[in-house]
Regions:
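Short, structured beta-strand-loop surface elements
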Residues: 29-30, 82-160
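Extracellular/periplasmic catalytic domains that process cell-envelope and extracellular macromolecules
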Residues: 42-44, 60-62, 69, 90, ...
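Short N-terminal segments immediately surrounding and downstream of signal-peptide cleavage
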Residues: 30-50
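Short, P/G- and charge-enriched loop/turn segments at secondary-structure junctions
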Residues: 37-39, 55, 139-144
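Short beta-strand segments
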Residues: 46-80, 95-98, 106-110
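Sec/Tat signal peptide C-region and signal peptidase I cleavage site
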Residues: 24-28
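Bacterial N-terminal signal peptides that target proteins for export
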Residues: 2-15
């Protein structure tokens, strides 16, 4: 007699999201070196971070929300190389990051602008695990967009 299998889509979804939450928590633990512990704890469950750059006159730019991923002991996201944000970062502006919302508190980070198609694909996979629309193939980093110059990767690490 053949055993029947039973699949519960709701339970499968809940278990998948629980595994993702555990993975995000483990990735956030990798960031513990250098970032404030409360900041790292909030990153584990955050859907977006809020970022601002510093203008030439020393004032901060508008605070904007961005999707992000955690990999290789850093916070990563993408932006257009033509954005004000990217231009300021290329000239050496620090990036100020908040997890709780536009009002902070903010953590100052060091930024590396990266052009690497393989890393873009890896970040796309991280996004796909975190954001359902990225999982469906939309709004996710990719080798093609990075190598064509449509996006740059931004790697955020603690200011030492």
């Amino acid at each position: 007699m053949k055993a029947e299998s039973y699949s519960n889509p709701w339970l499968t979804s809940v278990l998948a999201w629980a595994m993702l939450a555990l993975a995000a928590g483990a990735m956030a633990e990798e960031l513990a070196h250098g970032f404030p512990s409360d900041f790292v704890a909030r990153l584990a469950t955050a859907q977006e971070i809020y970022v601002a750059t510093q203008r030439k006159d020393g004032t901060h730019s508008e605070v904007v929300p961005v999707w992000f991923g955690l990999m290789d002991n850093a916070i990563w996201f993408t932006t257009s190389p033509e954005s004000h944000k990217a231009k300021r970062l290329k000239r050496g502006s620090p990036l100020f990051v908040a997890v709780q919302g536009k009002d902070g508190p903010f953590v100052k980070t060091k930024v590396e602008v990266v052009q690497d198609g393989a890393l873009a694909d890896r970040l796309g996979e991280v996004y796909a695990q975190k954001y359902w629309i990225a999982w469906a193939g939309f709004f996710r980093p990719s080798r093609a967009r990075n190598e064509s110059g449509k996006t740059v990767l931004l790697k955020l690490t603690p200011v030492e």
